[in-house]
UniProtKB/Swiss-Prot annotation:
Gene Ontology biological process terms, A to Z: translation
Subunit structure: Part of the 30S ribosomal subunit. Contacts proteins S5 and S12.
A GO term from the CC aspect: ribonucleoprotein complex
Gene source species: Allorhizobium ampelinum (strain ATCC BAA-846 / DSM 112012 / S4)
Keyword Ribosomal protein belongs to the record: yes
Highest classification ranks of the organism: Bacteria, Pseudomonadati, Pseudomonadota, Alphaproteobacteria, Hyphomicrobiales
Gene name, Swiss-Prot/TrEMBL: rpsH
Keywords: Ribonucleoprotein, Ribosomal protein, RNA-binding, rRNA-binding
GO molecular function terms noted in the UniProt entry: rRNA binding; structural constituent of ribosome
Function: One of the primary rRNA binding proteins, it binds directly to 16S rRNA central domain where it helps coordinate assembly of the platform of the 30S subunit.
Family to which the UniProt record says this protein belongs: Belongs to the universal ribosomal protein uS8 family.
Pfam families associated with the record: Ribosomal_S8
Alphabetized PANTHER family for the sequence: 40S RIBOSOMAL PROTEIN S15A
Keyword DNA damage in annotation: no
Xref: NCBIfam families: PRK00136.1
Protein name per Swiss-Prot or TrEMBL: Small ribosomal subunit protein uS8
């Protein structure tokens, strides 16, 4: 069966894994998912991730979730731009999450990046998700 929203599926797996206090979660691999995970790792929301290629054209990503004093570092994670309704913003209208305590991840012409990087590089794009 085909997946309508692969990025949304990955975010749901992370949310569910964190709710169940899992050490790691597994998701099918893609370039977009890996770029979003790069941002999450750089911002300190996950410990890391590793790609596993099974050789039959199906690769998986194992995401190591991060906890602080028994609670997940990720309190909320959600998709903003969805396949049925894309959300694009200019650099002036990039949303802040929790008054700057969280991040918004954007897909820009310069690559996938966090909101503060997009503001520094003066570039807008598609709002993929928000994390707090």
């Amino acid at each position: 069966m085909t997946m309508t929203d692969p990025l949304g599926d990955m975010l749901t797996r992370i949310r569910n894994g964190a709710a169940r206090r899992k050490a790691s979660v597994v998701t099918p691999a893609s370039k977009l998912r890996a770029r979003v995970l790069d941002v999450l790792q750089a911002e300190g929301y996950i410990r890391g991730y590793s790609e596993i290629d099974h050789g039959n054209g199906k690769a998986e990503i194992t995401i190591e979730l991060k906890y602080y004093e028994g609670a997940s570092v990720i309190r909320e994670i959600g998709r903003v731009s969805k396949p049925g309704r894309r959300v694009y913003v200019s650099v002036k209208s990039i949303p802040q999450v929790a008054n700057g305590l969280g991040i918004t991840i954007l897909s820009t012409p310069k690559g996938v990046m966090a909101d503060h990087q997009a503001r520094e590089q003066n570039v807008g794009g598609e709002v993929l998700c928000s994390v707090f």
